[in-house]
Swiss-Prot record:
Signal peptide: none annotated. Residues 45-108 form the S5 DRBM domain. Residues 1-41 are annotated as: Disordered. This is Small ribosomal subunit protein uS5. Keywords: Ribonucleoprotein, Ribosomal protein, RNA-binding, rRNA-binding. With S4 and S12 plays an important role in translational accuracy. Located at the back of the 30S subunit body where it stabilizes the conformation of the head with respect to the body. Part of the 30S ribosomal subunit. Contacts proteins S4 and S8. GO terms for biological process: translation. Belongs to the universal ribosomal protein uS5 family. GO terms for cellular component: small ribosomal subunit.
Length: 213
């Protein structure tokens, strides 16, 4: 057999192997493409790290240190979640927090880039008040409230923290408030009235224009 024939046979075998790997979800080196798919999935979300703390645990041999991370993940289109990760290294703690946040996703009802009605969220000593705002107002929020609203995709809102300054309490109070939001249709159905009787005219116009989330 000539060298050209041997090279041709190897090329055909390599092509067949490559096709099999593609069908089985593997790359040319035999590894799966799951890692690449996970990176693409993560790039679709907005991640914000609110706090990173170092904690210690007293054991028989002394103290054992680890890190905790409070992470907020959202798609910027109404979905948001909060996660808390703990690990021996900071990157691992952030990764665990982001994974937990994606598991805790919930949808925030919005119309024209703002929330549907005023709401007040409370968790432990944290109290956060949020009100709808006109287009162009922006996100009027500070501290740990802002990253939650930005990851959720809220564009215009008025907010104020009335309780504890602890970032964890503020984040959970903000999430508790956002989970209290309801759509105008739900309020109308609950009261047995039409949507026009419940929702303001500006909200109805924005909803008719397809600006609700």
């Amino acid at each position: 057999m000539s060298g050209r024939e041997r090279n041709g046979g190897r090329s055909a075998e390599n092509n067949d192997k490559k096709e099999r790997n593609e069908r089985n979800g593997r790359n040319d080196r035999g590894g799966r493409n799951d890692r690449r798919n996970q990176q693409d999935e993560r790039s679709q979300f907005i991640e914000r790290v609110v706090t990173i703390n170092r904690v210690s645990k007293v054991v028989k041999g002394g103290r054992r240190f680890s890190f905790t991370a409070l992470v907020i993940v959202g798609d910027g289109q109404g979905m948001v979640g909060v996660g808390y990760g703990k690990a021996k290294e900071v990157p691992a703690a952030i990764q665990k927090g982001a994974e937990e946040a994606r598991k805790n996703f919930f949808r925030v009802p919005m119309i024209n880039g703002t929330i549907t009605h005023p709401v007040q969220g409370e968790d432990a000593a944290g109290i956060v008040m949020m009100k709808p705002a006109a287009p162009g107002t922006g996100v009027i929020a500070g501290g740990a409230v802002r990253p939650v609203l930005e990851c959720a995709g809220v564009q215009d809102i008025l907010s104020k923290s009335l309780g504890s300054d602890n970032a964890i309490n503020i984040v959970h109070a903000t999430v508790a408030g956002l989970k209290q939001l309801v759509r105008p249709e739900e309020v109308a159905a609950r009261r047995g009235k039409s949507l026009d009787e419940v929702a303001p005219a500006a909200m109805l116009r924005a909803r008719a224009a397809g600006q609700g989330a």
